[in-house]
From Swiss-Prot:
Protein name: Histone-lysine N-methyltransferase CLF
Residue span of region Disordered: 1-33, 73-107, 335-522, 875-902
Residues noted as binding S-adenosyl-L-methionine in the record, renumbered to the chain: Y866
The encoding gene: CLF
Lineage: Eukaryota, Viridiplantae, Streptophyta, Embryophyta, Tracheophyta
GO biological process: abscisic acid-activated signaling pathway; callus formation; cell differentiation; DNA-mediated transformation; flower development; leaf morphogenesis; methylation; negative regulation of gene expression, epigenetic
KO phenotype (gene knockout): Misexpression of AGAMOUS, recognizable phenotypes (e.g. curly leaves, and early flowering time) and loss of H3K27me3 histone H3-tail marks. Double mutant plants atx1 clf exhibits normal leaf-phenotype and flowering time. The double mutant clf-50 swn-1 is hypersensitive to abscisic acid (ABA) associated with reduced ABA-responsive genes repression by histone H3 'Lys-27' methylation (H3K27me3).
GO cellular component: nucleus; PcG protein complex
Function: Polycomb group (PcG) protein. Catalytic subunit of some PcG multiprotein complex, which methylates 'Lys-27' of histone H3, leading to transcriptional repression of the affected target genes, mainly abscisic acid (ABA) responsive elements. Required to regulate floral development by repressing the AGAMOUS homeotic gene in leaves, inflorescence stems and flowers. Together with ATX1, modulates AG nucleosome methylation statement. Regulates the antero-posterior organization of the endosperm, as well as the division and elongation rates of leaf cells.
Organism expressing this protein natively: Arabidopsis thaliana (Mouse-ear cress)
């Protein structure tokens, strides 16, 4: 017994561990004992103080209660007149004294006996009152009714409700007691060591002792001997106390920041543990928690709604900010660059960035963003610098007397200083992304005609450069310096920007404006890099998921996934940064050949979209559907239908195959089809493909779903659809009865009204409220999902009570409706039933449906055949043998308790 084993175990724990002399480091045992004794005395003193406080509080509460009782008793005493006692008055007016019934004769009426003195109310003379007793009619006793919990869907049994390994006591009808022992010695309950939890005083002693003396073997040994624990338990408890202290000191702010510093997988740990992806509910009672996460191999294309240039998502929408030219973080570009004036007093404003940003269309690719335009401006200025430096050096060497040569030499030095101020990492990144940025400039900043013109010019750029280099001397002699620079810029800069660059170079004070533009580009790039660093891992993960769902639409991403974290402009900045482009098209964003799945508008391309069926394309003609049964998915179903119809169904567990399932697929090995919950692609040959029924309403064996004892699934079947809503807002017009699927009754919970009443056969029964026709769905038989071993143990009690609520579901589970279920659990057995039960797979789960075997009128009781095995059926469920029939002696007895079959 556990009580006998506990002293020995506690004695073994109380023995202090024998430490070697080398391990005895730390304070002496005497010092540790003194600290523990002082803490013990302090705890005792604190306990005395707390007890005194509690006694004082109880005294006050007791005084208030006694005062209320005293007040109520005084009120009752004052209500009596002339000081008479209420108890005496009640005895005088009792019915026994008035009727003359002698209580000494067991309350039986004696007609000839002496008259018992009774006081009639209002008279002081005792008189005899003759009253004959009235015999109450005998009412039939109600049938025993077991308390049960209503279930609208099946639930899996919890571990604490199991009876396996427990000794159950059964009380029979005569009031006796019977002890049901285990079937074998293996199921005997093992005497486990009693676990003791740490109390609050023990935690206090452990924490304070280790804080004062430190963590050492000698201290742990003394604590173990004092608390009758092992050293490992003391050490583990100390670690738990330290963690609790750190959590309490950190506060909620640190917990929130730690959550934001996690990625999406870490933040969704509890979500994945509690959320059922099959039922789409939290804390699913059918499939349980901590399910294996199975993600589909094929993901749908991003949802890209039509883009309206004038429709914005808010004040911080990137469309509004691009049009206004005011960027959060660094204000307006015009305000930063300021104005420049030459000697004549002419003022110029560098409008290069603002003009490009305002001219951007919202439908463009991320490379057409503000960052790409700014980099385009930087590269354009760099190319201008290089070209002008080359021409200036040639001019200085060939004709040093040319006007303005000294000014251009100064410009060269200034630009070298500007280049030195730009970080080296930025220069390296610009060199690496020069090709991609040039393509983005051609596609984003230019019009389509200009982009084509740019592509044509790229093919002849080398020849043009050679021609210009050969005629450079002539151009330097005959042309002006401005013309030379303009011609050189037109070779390397897009056509849409050449006029703008030329105007800026020709303008007075262009040296100062270029320098300011370069400083502005450097500021913008630094601000963009700083913005990217402020993104936490959780926000980055949410952004990646938003790109996967909505594509390159910053408005939808900010509104649906980053609400409260980032604005639309911040999402747009992060999206258009060149460093983040690789992450958009990495992993799921790339095709196997390395090409991008997104086009210039952010839409998914090169994706294998499901072809539209010929049936939907040819709406005018209804062709004969050739639904094949030769695929591997229906081999097990066809075999069960033809050969093993009476065998139980197989429990479905989704597979996690990333490619088309092969011979080692768990579903294929188990003999089940792959469902929509599996991870394999839709091209898997083992996947159940639904039905193509058009006019049969899926109520005949020509429907593959109906023939396989399955309900149609709107996500899989082609023509089976469901009307959404409860009808309060109106029901859409139906396409006729020929298009309405009638094989989704359990899925839609379209059951009949069932009433509960006293049965004419046995106990309680189920009755139908409205008339139904043949093969109509009546309701579902729900209950607890238990194992077959559990069902055998529970069946012992059910056999003694001569009732059964066990229903065989599949090869792993049995339905038990004794404690939990619905009203159809009271439907009785009959050899000539008017209903029949059927196990149907609904959305990957086996469920039991009750259907009408014939036309049933309103008010009739429901019966169906429990279909017990012949050797396990109770006496009341056995069919009467025909006269002259011989008993089959070759039938082998089955193992287990009687269970209902469909």
């Amino acid at each position: 017994m556990a009580s006998e084993a506990s002293p020995s175990s506690s004695a073994t724990r109380s023995e202090p561990p024998k430490d070697s002399p080398a391990e005895e480091r730390g304070p002496a045992s005497k010092e540790v004992s003194e600290v523990i004794e002082s803490l013990k005395k302090k705890l005792a003193a604190d306990r005395c103080i707390s007890i005194k406080k509690r006694i004082d509080e109880n005294k006050k509460n007791l005084f208030a209660i006694t005062q209320s009782f005293m007040r109520s008793s005084m009120e009752r005493g004052g209500s009596c007149k002339d000081g008479s006692d209420l108890l005496v008055k009640r005895q005088r007016d009792s019915p026994g004294m008035k009727s003359g019934i002698d209580e000494s004769n067991n309350n039986r009426y004696v007609e000839d006996g002496p008259a018992s003195s009774g006081m009639v109310q209002g008279s002081s003379v005792p008189v005899k009152i003759s009253l004959r007793p009235i015999k109450m009619p005998d009412i039939k006793r109600l049938s025993p009714y077991t308390t049960w919990v209503f279930l609208d869907r099946n639930q899996r049994m919890t571990e604490d409700q199991s009876v396996v390994g427990r000794r159950r006591i059964y009380y029979d009808q005569t009031g006796g007691e019977a002890l049901i022992c285990s079937d074998s010695e293996e199921e005997a309950i093992d005497d486990e060591e009693e676990k003791r939890d740490f109390l609050e005083p023990e935690d206090y002693i452990i924490r304070m002792t280790l804080e004062q003396l430190g963590l050492s073997d000698s201290v742990l040994a003394e604590l173990a001997s004092f608390l009758s624990r092992s050293t490992s338990e003391i050490k583990a408890r100390h670690g738990v106390l330290m963690k609790e202290k750190e959590v309490s000191e950190s506060g909620d702010n640190q917990a929130e920041s730690s959550l934001l510093n996690k990625d999406m997988e870490g933040a969704l740990d509890s979500f994945d543990n509690l959320f059922c992806r099959r039922c789409l509910v939290f804390d699913c009672r059918l499939h349980g928690c901590s399910q294996d996460l199975i993600f589909p191999a094929e993901k749908p294309a991003p949802w890209c709604p039509p883009v309206d240039e004038n429709l914005t998502c808010g004040a911080n929408c990137y469309k509004t900010l691009l049009k206004s030219g005011r960027f959060p973080g660094y204000g307006t570009i015009e305000g930063k660059t300021g104005t420049s004036s030459d000697g004549a007093g002419t003022k110029t404003t560098p409008t290069k960035f603002s003009s490009k940003l305002n001219g951007r269309k919202p439908k463009t690719f991320p490379s057409e963003s503000a960052s790409s335009n700014e980099k385009c401006a930087l590269e354009t200025s760099d190319s201008e610098n290089g070209l002008q430096q080359d021409t200036n050096s040639d001019k200085v060497s060939s004709s040093p007397k040319v006007k303005g040569s000294g000014r251009r030499v100064g410009r060269k030095r200034n630009k070298n200083r500007v280049a030195e101020r730009v970080p080296r990492k930025t220069q390296k990144r610009q060199k690496k992304t020069e090709a991609s940025d040039s393509d983005s400039i051609a596609s984003g900043s230019c019009s389509p005609s200009d982009a084509k013109h740019k592509d044509n010019e790229d093919a002849t750029s080398s020849s043009q450069k050679h021609v210009k280099s050969g005629n450079s001397g002539k151009s330097r002699k005959n042309g002006t310096p401005a013309e030379v620079s303009n011609n050189s810029v037109k070779d390397d800069v897009p056509v849409c920007q050449s006029n703008e660059v030329a105007s800026e170079l020709d303008a007075p004070g262009s040296d100062e404006s270029l320098r300011k533009e370069e400083f502005m580009g450097e500021t913008v790039s630094r601000g963009r890099l700083a913005t990217n660093k402020l993104w936490r891992p959780l926000e980055k993960s949410l952004f990646d998921k938003g790109v996967e769902i909505f594509g390159m639409n910053s408005c939808l991403i900010a509104r649906n996934l980053l609400s409260g974290f980032k604005s639309c402009w911040e999402v747009f900045q992060y999206m258009t940064c060149s460093e983040n482009k690789a992450s958009f098209f990495g992993g799921d964003g790339l095709n196997p050949d390395g090409s991008s799945k997104f086009d210039i508008n952010g839409n998914m391309v090169n994706n294998q979209v499901r072809r539209r069926s010929r049936f939907l394309r040819r709406r005018g003609k209804v062709r004969r559907l050739k639904y094949t049964w030769k695929s591997a998915a229906y081999h097990s179903i066809r075999k069960r239908i033809t050969e093993k119809k009476d065998q139980p169904c197989r429990q479905f567990n989704p597979c996690n195959c990333k490619i088309a399932c092969g011979k080692e697929c768990p579903c294929l090995l188990n003999g089940t089809c792959c469902e929509k919950y599996c991870g394999c692609p839709k091209s898997c040959k083992n996947r159940f493909r639904g039905c193509h029924c058009a006019k049969s309403q899926c109520r005949s064996r020509q429907c593959p779903c109906f023939a396989a004892d399955r309900e149609c699934d709107p996500d899989v079947c082609r023509n089976c659809w469901v009307i959404g809503g409860d009808g309060s807002l109106g029901v859409p017009s139906q396409r006729g009865d020929n298009y309405e699927c009638r094989n989704m009754k359990l899925l839609l919970k379209q059951q009949q009204r069932v009433l509960l009443g006293i049965s004419d056969v046995s106990g309680w029964g189920a009755f139908l409220k409205n008339s139904v026709s043949k093969h109509e769905y009546l309701g579902e038989y729900t209950g607890e999902l238990i194992s077959h071993k559990e069902a055998d143990k529970r069946g012992k009690i059910y056999d003694r009570e001569n009732c059964s609520f066990l229903f065989n579901l599949n090869d792993q589970f049995v339905l038990d409706a004794y404690r939990k279920g619905d009203k159809l659990k009271f439907a009785n057995h009959s050899p000539e039933p008017n209903c029949y039960a059927k196990v149907i797979m609904v959305a990957g789960d086996h469920r039991v449906g009750i259907f009408a075997k014939e036309r049933i009128l309103a008010g009739e009781e429901l019966f169906y055949d429990y279909r017990y095995e012949p050797d396990r059926a109770p006496a009341w469920a056995k069919k009467p043998e025909a006269p002259g029939s011989k008993k089959d002696e070759n039938v082998t007895p089955s193992v287990g308790r009687p269970k209902k079959l469909a």
